[in-house]
Amino acid sequence: DAIISTLKKHGIKGGFFFTGEFYELYPDVVKRLLDEGHFVGSHSYGHLLYMPWEDRDSLLVTREEFENDMMKSYETLHKASIEYKDAPVYIPPYEYYNKEISAWAKNMGIQVINYTPGTMSNADYTTPDMGQKYRSSKFIYDKIMEVEKKEGLNGHLMLMHFGTDDRRTDKFYNGYLDKMIKTLKRKGYTFVP
């Protein structure tokens, strides 16, 4: 609710990408997002890991498994009144894919998209027990502002997780999201889904 409320407060429409399980568990959230005019798309059905972390050129899924997972994802979108043609882009699980996955998606009429690396906005899922991989909300905010100062953020896609582990009590969307939007609006940025 914090993300939706913050975006509404600032008159911003966002893009939300969920797994099939999320669509099944939280249809009321999906309906609210649609009613408020946000883009809602696929993040796969089962959040499969497509390839090993150590070898991006190999695969852990077959084309058939990939296509079945994506079709199941789009079936859940359809149940939420989102038609295939209205959700032509998707963010792969773990934001991790290769050219083969991109080609398979393209053959299904789906375009792979991903966040712009560098801002660390995607690190809002990390928890303190992850040691050096943990990124506090202040760190993420400061990194976004650092990138903005060095190169600007025009065209950047920032990824923030709709929900995070309870072990992360420092939720970016509880304060820093609002602060970031205010700061970027003051600098003349506009936001698009």
Model-derived regions, located:
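Solvent-exposed loop/turn segments at secondary-structure junctions
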Residues: 21-24, 39-40, 45-50, 94-99, ...
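Structural recognition of the beta-strand scaffold that forms the well-ordered cores
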Residues: 14-18, 39-42, 86-92, 111-115, ...
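Acidic-and-aromatic substrate-binding clefts and catalytic sites of carbohydrate-active enzymes
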Residues: 1, 17-27, 90-99, 133-137, ...
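Non-membrane alpha-helical structural segments and their capping/turn regions in soluble enzymes
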Residues: 60-68, 134-138, 170-174, 178
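Terminal accessory/targeting
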Residues: 4-15, 28-31, 119, 130, ...
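Acidic/histidine-rich helix-loop elements
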Residues: 50-64, 125-137
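His/Asp/Glu-enriched short active-site or ligand-binding loop at hydrolase and phosphoryl-transfer sites
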Residues: 101-148, 189-193
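Active-site beta->alpha N-cap acidic-glycine motif
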Residues: 1-58, 71-88, 180-183
